Structures are given as C-alpha cells and as structure tokens.
Amino acid sequence: MELHITPALALLCEHHLLDHVSNLTDFTATSVSYDSRKVKSGTLFFCKGNFLPKYLASAKEKGAIAYVAEKEYPEGEGLPAIIVNDEQKAMSLLGAAFYDYPQNDLFIIAITGTKGKTTTAYFADHILAQSTANHIALFSTLDRILGNKPEDEFKSDLTTPESLDLFHDMRAAVDNGMTHLVMEVSSQAYKKNRIYGLKYDVGIFLNISPDHIGRNEHPTFADYLHCKEQLLVNSAKCLINAETEKFTDVYYTAKATTQPEDIFLFARRGANIELPDNAQIDFEYRNDLEDLHESEFELTALTEKAKQLNLDGRYKTSVPGDYNEGNAVAAIIASGLAGASANDAVETLNHVHIRGRMEMINSNTHGTIYVDYAHNYASLKRLLAFLKRQTNAGKVTVVLGATGDKGISRRPGFGKALTEEQPDEVILTTDDPGFEDPMTIAREIDSYIDHDKVKHIQFEMDRETAIKKAIDGSGNDDIVVLAGKGEDPYQKINGEDVPYLTDVKIARDYINDLER
C-alpha cells in the first residue's frame, strides 16, 4: 500500500479540507499512522485527538515522511506539513485512499441504534456466513473478524474503530477473500468523523433513546440523534424500525437522500405508529413464543418490494428476549437485501450465541444468573421487565454500576428503571469509573432510586465481591442480574484498562466453587 502526495492533496482539495502545505516535496507514503509508537520510515503521520507535540517529534525521529495536522508544529520542522481544517475528515479520506478503497469490494451492512447493535450484527453475520460460504467480515463491539483463520479474529477496543484502523481491517478482509461486511456504527464515529466519506449498501436504524449525553460525548439529545441519522444519509438502502422514538425525524432524514423504493420499514404487528406522507410498513412480525431460552416469531411482507425478497416465514432465535426479535427481523431483512434467503436465516438464527448478551448461568442452589450488557435506562428496563414476565422468581437481585467521564444520563436512567421494575435487592458497584470515584457514581445512581419501592440497596465497589455477595444471598428460585459489562475483560480506571475476569467468568467460577 502507498499514497503519493499529488493525489492526496487533490483529494483534500476536492473535499475543501486543505488549508496549505509547507516544505512541500515529492514523496510517496508507504505507511500511515496516528500512533507515534508505530511509525516507521516512510510514514505519513496524523496529529489527531489527544495529540501532544512530543508525539510528532518521536514520529519524525522514527522516519515519518510528512505530517497532517490542523496547524504547524516546530517539532515537525523540515517535514512536509499538510495543514487541513479538519484532521479527522482528512485522516478518513487519506486512509481510504492509502488502503485502495477496500470498501468498494465489500457489500457493507451498517447498524446503528441505542441498543441492539451487537445482537443484530451477530444475527446478520451468521445468516450471511451461511449464504456467502463464510465470506463475511464482522466489526462489532465485541470482535473484529477479518477472515476465517484464528489469527484473523481480534477483540474490539471501540464499537467503530479509528478510520486508519477501519480501512486497514477492511483491506485485510478483502485480501482474505471476504465479500461482505457487517459493522456496528456508533454515534461517536460520526461525531468525531471517523467514517467521513464511507458509504454503505444497507444502513439499519434500530432505535433511539437518550444515552451518551454529557461531557466528552453529545451535548444534547438532538446532537445524538443527528449523529445517529447520518448512517441513513450515507446508505444506498435504508432499513428502519418504525417503532423507534423520533420515527418521523428518522424517516425524513432517510427520505432526504434515498428514494422511497429503497427505504424499508418494519414493525411488530399491531404497533401504534403514525406514518408520515405515503410511508408504508413493509414487514411486520408477530411473536409466537418466548421463554428464557428462545424466541419464535412470524415475519410477513406487506408491500410489493418487500414480497420480492421472499422472506416470509417462521423464525426461531436462541437469544431470548422479545426485544431481540426486532433485532433478528432487522438482520433477516438486511441479509435478504444482500442476497441471503429465508432458509439461510432459518438454519442459522437458532444457533447464535452472543457473549454477554442475555447469557444464562444455572446453579443448583443459588438460582439463575443472567449476564447482560444492559447499560442504559431502556435496555435495563426491558431486560428486567422480560425476566419478570418469564419467571416466577422468588427474589431478584441486580448488580450494576455506571461509567465515569461519560454517559452521565445513564445514572438517572438506571435509577428510573430500578424504581419502575422494583427488584428486591440492588448492589451498586464499579463499572469503568475512569477518573471519577466509583462510590460517588454509585451514590448518584442511588439518589435517583425511589427507596419506598426499592428498599434494599447495598454499596460494594469491588465488582467481583459484589457479584459473589449477590450469588451468596440467592436461593434456588431466585435471579441475579449482572448488568452493564457483559463480556468486557477490563475496567477503565484512571486512564488505564485494568484486566478484569468478566462477569461471566467470575459468576461461573464462583458457582463451581460453591457447588463442588
């Protein structure tokens, strides 16, 4: 891979990003990086994010051939300086060019929503693995899968990677023979222009509810919604859950750049929805069976364009939760738009396992433990409401915390969900506190709980101890809900990723010790 200065500057000019160039020479970059630790001879270096001038000095010392920034730095003296008005946009465009536009060789399904992105991504990944003979790549909150060999699978650091990493991984997927890609897209990816210029074949909008609002994230819900909607603006075909909040806004955003015949709407049968203009529900689904182990539903095409996909039928998923049926429907339709058949979905959906999503751990003497990534008001409420409907549990204990430095709106949201669903006991603990004091976060959550409705609340800042306390206090017919972290293998504390065994492993190991 390489990038010559002349087409690079032309590309920046085309997007009105280039301010000026200092010390211009004729060069070809043979690598690109925003991390000075990874710079080698011939690298085009990007000064991004939490940049410090010393990083540029280090990059220069290691052989950087030029740098891209929003201003010139003395530390880069003697190097060609490509000065732009938006470094993140420039990095995305030049990253795509350096890796020779791998997105053009992939059918890309992109998914956004406040909740359900990962579950939908895994459903679609399994369906398309069946229909493409495993020529499918996956970029999710949990994993980045670039091929079919063990060395092609990595743990994810971000829901949507930095642009250079994203295009690097796309290139690797294409070189590994992948023809399709399913990827989650976060609102932050648009807020920070990580995916500027990237287009999708199918864009899925699952839902929207207040989240990621506060310092270091989105200043308002309107800003959060706007960033989510950008996925539809950049998609050739749009698939929208018509039951989402702000549906009219979302629909009009899609319609502004997409022809009506390329917009597909789905909803649960009987849902109370006000449809704008001449919009029609294209697919409806009806729940036929739900329990703690699986869900079964019927999908019906209502419009001519929907009927052409031949996706009518009954489907069964191994991921419980009535709310996950909508995620499965989105995956079925999107996969159908990518060429998959109804049979591909029927054969695969009942075999999908997603780590840390409604993961159930049984015990002989301490009830049932559920591990779920529920990390905001909407997802926690839906999880607790579902478990309440599906079980005759004696006591329900919830273990949770809230992240520090971001997502401040989650704290009142947790208090509201707990008040409304009224578990018998709550243990407030640590969950990625960042630079905040976890006890302060826990007490803030507690301040939003109605103590007349939730009477038993404990504080235990060691999460492993909190989990063990919850299990110790539970009997045969009881339920323990470990919410918020799912399969996260670390705690973010004071700027470091501190290794953490994961909620699943801690609970399983402790149950095994107790029942030995």
PLM region spans:
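Structural beta-sheet core signal
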Residues: L138, M183, G203, I240, ...
